[in-house]
């Protein structure tokens, strides 16, 4: 997804399907109805103009329309909670071992519909970075 103003790209973000593993060591995981949001960027000349919030609001709506159950993100809790993200441990979702979180709130998750993550849980599998 990209945001444009006056024909210039001023921001972008990406959703990728990230499977959950039932154990902290990763390994084989079933396909998931959950996507990860990353990266997100806004051009410095356009900071504090609500571009990030607007982009994410539209993107989250698109993820809902596509039928995904939830979205994970790693980042600034104070920013992402403004668009509905909560600490992922509230949903039983954690990073895999080998990727320690210095601030536990930086791993966040959002349901696409009330209760859509009920019964989900596990560890985000980062293996796709190494197998790309």
Task: Locate each region found by the language model.
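Short loop segments at secondary-structure junctions
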Residues: 6-7, 45, 111-116
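A short, structural micro-pattern
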Residues: 31-34, 101-102
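Conserved acetyl-CoA-binding loop-helix of GNAT-fold acetyltransferases
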Residues: 37, 42, 48-61, 72-73
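Conserved active-site alpha-helix within GNAT-family acetyltransferase domains
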Residues: 65-69, 75-102
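C-terminal "cap" of GNAT-fold acetyltransferases
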Residues: 94-132
